Structures are given as structure tokens and as C-alpha cells.
């Protein structure tokens, strides 16, 4: 989806909805609906709905890619300390649907749906660190498991809600 051209379904001051009809082999019958919303000044919501109109199941492993400003390298992820200088190659961490992250005094709650693995990384090319909720991390490098599929004529929703605490 990153290199694809998405169609705008709707747009207003605080919401945008995008649509992609796949042309990739094996995904010809798949529609991707991506919705972003800013419900208030402290929240951002992203939802991806994968609609499989074909007969065969399709493999998916999506993720959202939020970058957070972080001048320093130290951050906290669910109470565990991390140093961004040591995660340049990505660390995959399982997390419950409610996650707590803190960077340089910025405190966030991230609530997810069907995204139980976080990719934690920073290439230190800028003053940011990434805490990216994913369906199964780098799962496409391994044989498929059942949770990675959207059944024929089925839908699956993935969601992320970021709430600023301080």
C-alpha cells in the first residue's frame, strides 16, 4: 500500500477516508479501506478494513507507522526502558491492546485492534522514535499462520488509537 495510489472516499477538517483496489497478484479481489480521524486535540485514530471479495483466503500483515518526536534516546514502552541507539534494526515486542509509551516527557496511550506486535526502532537520522503496532511484525519472512488471513468473502479490521496523556 505504501507505493500505491489511494482514492479519497471522503474528507473534512478532521477525517479522511481512503480506498485502494489491489491489482497485485493474489489480491485482485481485495479492497483496502483506510480511515484517519482526529476526534479531538489529544487523539488520533486510524482504521484499516480489508475486504476480501474473492473465494480464496488472502494473507495480510498490516501495521501503522507512527513516528514520535524524541530528542533523547531513552524511552519507556509498557514500563520497560529502551534506548533508541540500540534498536536501529527493529525490535519486535508483543503487547496487549492497551500500550503505554513515554518519550522525553511525551506520554501516550495506544489502543489497538488485531495489532498485537510492535516494531520499535529508530534509525537516528532524525529526532524521532517509532513504536509501530503491527499484525505480526515481520511475519511475511516466515510461513503463514492462520491469524494472517482474511477468509474468502470476509472482512478484517485493524485499528490504532493514540491518546496524548501529557
Feature names for model-found ranges:
Residues 17-23, 97-166:
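Beta-strand-rich recognition/accessory modules
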Residues 25, 41, 53-55, 67, ...:
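Short coil/turn motifs at secondary-structure junctions
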Residues 33-35, 89-91, 145-151:
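Beta-strand-rich interaction surfaces with strong enrichment in secreted/lumenal proteins
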Residues 34-36, 44-52:
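Short, well-ordered beta-strand segments enriched in hydrophobic/aromatic residues
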Residues 38, 50, 162-164:
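Hydrophobic beta-strand positions in extracellular immunoglobulin-like domains
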Residues 40-41, 152:
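Surface-exposed loops/turns
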Residues 55-118:
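Active-site/ligand-binding surface loops and adjacent short beta/alpha elements
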Amino acid at each position: 500500500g505504501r507505493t500505491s495510489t489511494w482514492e479519497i472516499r471522503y474528507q473534512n477538517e478532521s477525517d479522511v477516508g481512503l480506498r485502494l483496489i489491489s491489482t497485485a497478484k493474489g489480491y485482485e479481489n481485495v479492497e483496502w479501506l483506510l480511515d484517519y480521524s482526529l476526534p479531538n486535540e489529544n487523539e488520533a485514530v486510524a482504521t484499516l478494513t480489508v475486504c476480501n471479495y474473492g473465494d480464496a483466503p488472502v494473507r495480510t500483515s498490516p501495521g501503522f507507522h507512527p513516528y514520535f518526536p524524541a530528542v533523547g534516546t531513552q524511552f519507556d514502552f509498557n514500563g520497560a526502558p529502551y534506548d533508541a541507539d540500540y534498536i536501529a534494526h527493529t525490535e519486535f515486542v508483543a503487547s496487549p491492546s492497551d500500550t503505554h509509551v513515554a518519550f522525553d516527557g511525551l506520554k501516550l496511550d495506544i489502543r489497538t485492534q488485531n495489532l498485537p506486535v510492535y516494531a520499535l526502532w529508530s534509525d537516528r537520522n532524525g529526532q524521532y522514535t517509532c513504536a509501530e503496532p503491527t499484525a505480526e511484525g515481520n511475519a511475511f519472512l516466515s510461513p503463514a499462520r492462520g491469524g494472517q488471513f482474511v477468509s474468502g468473502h470476509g472482512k478484517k479490521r485493524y485499528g490504532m488509537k493514540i491518546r496524548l496523556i501529557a
